[in-house]
Regions:
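Acidic, PIN/NYN-like endoribonuclease modules and their adjacent C-terminal/linker elements
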Residues: 52, 56-84
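PIN-domain endoribonuclease scaffold, especially VapC-family toxins
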Residues: 1-53, 83-84
């Protein structure tokens, strides 16, 4: 049906879009950063700490509205784009 064809068309557009985005891996450097952070920030969530670890290992900036948690991590660059 035309609805099914439209769905596949939209799916293909989504795949094309996501292929243009660079994925950041949780590699050995990120894992080492994560282990340090995990011991320093026991109250922060594992996923947030993994995101922070990847960013620190790549010297990257985290775009987030969660400045309360991410802001606790020294040397982590964060930006909040939601307030503009």
């Amino acid at each position: 049906s035309s609805r099914l064809l439209l769905s596949y068309s939209e799916f293909e557009k989504s795949l094309d879009f996501f292929q243009t985005i660079q994925r950041l891996s949780f590699d050995t450097n990120a894992y080492n950063q994560f282990e340090i952070l995990r011991h320093q920030f026991r109250r922060l969530g594992t996923r947030d700490l993994r995101i922070a670890a990847i960013a620190l290992s790549l010297n990257a900036t985290v775009i987030t509205r969660n400045a309360k948690d991410f802001g606790q991590i020294k040397n982590l660059s964060i930006e909040d784009w939601s307030s503009d």
